[in-house]
Amino acid sequence: MKYDYKAVEAKWQKVWEDEKTFHVEIDHKKPKFYALVEFPYPSGAGLHVGHPRSYTALDVVSRKRRQNGYNVLYPMGWDAFGLPTENFAMKNHIHPAIVTKNNVDHFRSQLKALGFSFDWDREINTTDPEYYKWTQWICLQLYKHGLAYKKEMNVNWCTGCKCVLANEEVVNGVCERCGSEVVHRVKSQWMLKITAYADKLIDGLDGLDYIERVATQQKNWIGRSHGAEVNFGTTAGDTLTVYTTRCDTLFGATYMVVSPEHAMVKEWLDKGILKNADAVKAYQAEAARKSDFERSELNKEKTGVKLEGVMGINPVNDTEIPIFISDYVLSTYGTGAIMAVPAHDTRDWEFAKKFGLPIIEVVKGNTPSNLDEAAFTDVATGTLVNSGFLNGLSVTDAKKKMIDWLEANGKGCDKVNYKLRDWVFSRQRYWGEPIPMVKCEKCGWQPLPESSLPLTLPDITDFEPGPDGESPLARHKDWVKTTCPCCGGPATRETDTMPQWAGSSWYFLRYMDPHCKDAIASKEALEDWSPVDWYNGGMEHTTLHLLYSRFWHKFLYDIGAVPSPEPYQKRTAHGMILGLNPHSFVNLPAEEQEKLLKEYGSQKAAEKALEEKYGEMARHPIVKMSKSLGNVINPDEVVDQYGADTMRLYEMFMGDFEQAAPWQTSAIAGCNRFLDRVWALSDKLVEGEGYRPQIETLMHQTIKKVGADIETLKMNTAIAQLMTLVNALYDNGGATKAELETVVQLLNPFAPHMTEELWEKLGHSHDEQLAYYPWPKYEEAKCVESTVEIAVQVNGKVKARLKVAADIDAAAAIAAAKADPAVAAALEGKQLVKEIYVKGRLVNLAVKG
């Protein structure tokens, strides 16, 4: 009987929904397992094929863990506030709440059609006031503990979204969401003091099971460094403090650089000290148009202006050195001023070469260095020279001695610094959580009473941002005007809203108890489910959501609101699914290729023409999927044509889970054929109890490998092993009932619909569904082959293949080889000069004559 995937999948999805098969409650009799995937932003486009890769992988793990006897929590929800919905709503004149509901309904139906074992009773939505009540509550706690504050500051302003962006949301100088130019503006912003948790965020990684690249990216983003603050005098009578990790090179500082925004530059301009004020102001204006990323690119051309009229004074030798402003120094890192040692820093060397500044060697290596050609930056082998009391010391010892000198002479101190900046928490948009703060002329900023939460968004129709950069909420005076919770006088609400990252910074906690009225979750639920055992997501969220949520969780732990110091015990990441580039020559239809070859004479010339037309990306046959390229694959179409089980199986089989992989439609058909072969085995049952001797070893090997591979996300090799087993069953005339049952069990996490149907077909009752049926066990001793096949070569040419005992010794293997008729014929009349046995693989006989 042919497998009717549409009927079977609809049947089992209804069973799971009607019977709440995957609903979970606290059960202390079982070990808990909390699996988490990043909840999606429900866009109007619906799911793309990239979403199911992560969801399927953890669904496979969750299904196996249930069969291993775990109490599994695997939830799903919606990260539904944010700019794309608001922009769509403005364009189409629909309220964002309606857009969100429609998008969520579409996403939910798509996910259910893929057969994921989510507990839908725990579904959450960040735009639900009963959810964001607790987002607001967390923000109030941050404020009450001094971790939320308002500040006038230089901010990243997206010219497209018309709102402020966090540093992490600016990629290559443009908005990571809409791609518009990002410029700097001065605005009053709410900030969260994530820097107060910098050490905890780094140190906490040590006890976690995060893949190395995730942990490394977080450490690099936080950027903890150990160095010194050094106080340089100036000829204007001021002090310029710099932060350096190389205080050992202080004798080699030949100039200083300050950021264009440095407060001292403004002061010198105001006092008329600078003789080239016009040039300085022009450079400041130019720098203000660049993002921090553009300014700090290592390979960008170094620019700057010397400050005429003031000099710095090196504290170790009282030498006067010039001061420059340059945009490669950022006001947001360190002190906004640096000492420049061009002999031992590449950027300083490039700057010094451009402006003709002195280069003094103060660290000498074991081999001569040519400072005319490059800076010497080898810290490991360097010895101090031309450095007074540091001469002859190693770099490490010189750092310690210099810090001692600075502290003893009141010229500086040791200092730990971080690249991490505080989190810009304001957005000048409508579709976000209202910030629960009011401003009173008498009392200043005041938090709303917790009893008044949630502070809900007003139901308005005019939610376009204004050209002045104010939130659209500011125009709705009836909502803005309120009373001060402290004195009862008139006050105004904060009109900025929270960033999209707010709701996703604690959502994993709400899943534990989504209907709790009195707290983010009940104490019992938090203690039972915390922490998340396994969290999978995209690498692009490593320095955004993942860092923010760890910060919030650590804060909640510190105030006693959650029982674990870390939110996630294990973090893995999946590779992106890529698409074919329609502008690459190799992907063009044959007739189009032929046309180009005729026109340009060769493939190389045709490829060059395509590159001129479409840009550098035309070189790459495989690229990121995008609507503009028309290479986005709709999962609904795949499910309709092949079924959800085929879609799931293919996404797990398409390559190394952690690496990017190209979508190949032809390979989907191969996965579909494999499932058809498994289904057909139910019509090819052979007589016999248990596993037949000729298949028993492979059965145990497969149980072992599939189980281990699932736990290490080596899904592609697990499926390959199942394919090997199914081929072997066909080679042996079919499968016994026990053999097919094991195949069905092992395949179930990947293809749950078909396998549940086969399980029923094999005679199991409805109460014995595979969802909770015990995972098959293997015997280690039976995983070892009792016989192996060895090749027999004569002078390197294979003459025979023999089945021999796996533990056969060399003498017996060689004797068996010589006894084979084909080998004996090849040896006849020849002199045997060498015999080699490679255990379990081959016998090689060398002859002459």
Name the predicted role of every residue range.
Residues M1-L36, R66-P75, V99-H106, Y283-F324, ...:
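Conserved oxyanion/phosphate-binding beta-strand-loop segments in alpha/beta enzyme cores
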Residues K2, D18-E19, K91-D248, A263, ...:
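Residue patterns forming the tRNA-binding/recognition surfaces of aminoacyl-tRNA synthetases
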Residues Y3, R224-E229, G237, K364, ...:
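Long, charged, mostly alpha-helical binding arms that flank functional sites
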Residues D79, K144-H145, Y149-N156, D414-C443, ...:
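Helix-rich, typically C-terminal accessory recognition domains appended to large enzymatic cores
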Residues Y3, V8-Q13, V49, T135-K364, ...:
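NTP-handling and nucleic-acid-processing catalytic cores
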Residues M1-G46, V72, L201, A215-S225, ...:
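Non-catalytic terminal extensions that flank enzyme cores
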Residues V214-T241, K290-T319, I323-F324, W423, ...:
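Flexible, glycine/threonine-enriched loop-and-boundary segments that flank and lead into catalytic domains
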Residues E25-I94, T100, E123-I138, T244-T245, ...:
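N-terminal catalytic cores of NTP/NDP-binding nucleotidyl/phosphoryl-transfer enzymes
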